């Protein structure tokens, strides 16, 4: 009958065109679980005659500023392209990984300074005759546990510090 497609259908159509009838990971904000993702699943499974639309769903919490959700309507959004003019993408990525994806992340200057300092420390250690080492399964373990990036970063801190200390213990002066 008369009408227009809803936004759920737009996403199903884009997913099918770009990723196929079934794909591995579908993501979005926690605010999209219902009704958007539920409708996407229902119509995609029916249209494609499949049991599965996406194998894994990742619903992230919000990035906030001063504990307020970023939103265009509130005028408090930050654009990555603007940040890239001020700092490296590595700092931005480390900042985004500093909180579990299902936990809110408050975006602020302290967070960015801490991430910049962490990266500087890692780079200094690498430049200080640091030899690459294989990342152990123990260090990676948090990643396999619901993409626990803060746990992985903590393990990486410990590993980098320990490896750096060991390198200095065996060095001749």
Residue ranges and their predicted role:
Residues 1-130:
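Alpha-helical recognition segments enriched in aromatics with Gly/Pro capping
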Residues 33, 89-91, 96-97, 144, ...:
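Non-catalytic interaction-recognition regions
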Residues 105-107, 111-161:
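Helix-loop elements that line ligand-binding/catalytic pockets
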Residues 163-172:
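Conserved small/polar residues in nucleotide/adenosyl-binding loops
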């Amino acid at each position: 009958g008369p009408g227009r497609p809803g936004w759920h259908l737009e996403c199903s159509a884009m997913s099918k065109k770009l990723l196929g009838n079934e794909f591995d990971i579908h993501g979005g904000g926690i605010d999209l679980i219902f009704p958007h993702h539920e409708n996407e699943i229902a119509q995609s499974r029916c249209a494609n005659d499949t049991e599965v639309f996406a194998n894994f769903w990742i619903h992230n919490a919000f990035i906030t500023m001063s504990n307020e959700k970023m939103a265009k309507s509130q005028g408090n959004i930050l654009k990555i392209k603007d940040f890239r003019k001020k700092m490296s993408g590595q700092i931005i990525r480390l900042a985004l990984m500093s909180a579990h994806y299902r936990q809110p992340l408050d975006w602020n200057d302290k967070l960015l300074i801490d991430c910049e300092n962490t990266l500087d420390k890692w780079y200094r250690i690498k430049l200080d005759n640091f030899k690459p080492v294989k990342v152990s399964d123990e260090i990676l373990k948090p990643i396999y546990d619901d993409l626990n990036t803060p746990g992985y970063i903590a393990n990486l801190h410990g590993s980098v510090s320990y490896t750096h200390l060991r390198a200095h213990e065996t060095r001749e002066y």
